Amino acid sequence: MKILKMMAVAALFMPLLFSCSGGSSSKNNLLGAIPDQYAQFVEEKAQIKKEAENIKTAEDKKALIEKSEKMTAKWKEKIEESAKALSGKPIEIAECNFNVTEPMSLEFDDFFSKSDLKPKFNIKGTAIAKADTQTELNYVLKSIPVYLVGYDAEGKEVFKTKAGYVDVEDVNGKAFIKANTPVKFDPVRFGESDIEGSKTAKTYKLEVKE
């Protein structure tokens, strides 16, 4: 009887255990299924490239080209579907020097490269500088880049992509950001170098890198 009671209690708490343990990982999964899909695409593409080294006839070449085109079309469809699924999904931004005033999300636009299948996104939403900020960056242009930076569970930077820029002023030769200055978002793209980082990142921030 005691064992049955313990099993019943465990069953009651099982959903709670699963929701707590997996919550933060899926919640901050910036690119959804894309990293795994892109990794498989890159692997298959490398295999076809290896096969090309052994081409001996025109028929072999034609067959391999058809295989490559079919493989690319397959992954284009899958990656595009996953990219479109991210539309409207909020990007949770951790405490940083910018305030998100309208929820940020990725909206699929197109592919930067049709052969490499690097998806391009527009960033929706708005963010502004939280306070006056004196950077250590030399004042060169009237704006400086703002990056979307991802950190793993230990706080190590594992992902970084240029998200846009923010206007600055010249204060003693250094770039100065005035409070409430909006970030002007640029299209962002995802490529092979981002695969591992986007999978391990747990938190994201908007940052000016010095």
Region roles according to the model:
Residues 1-8:
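Bacterial N-terminal signal peptides that target proteins for export
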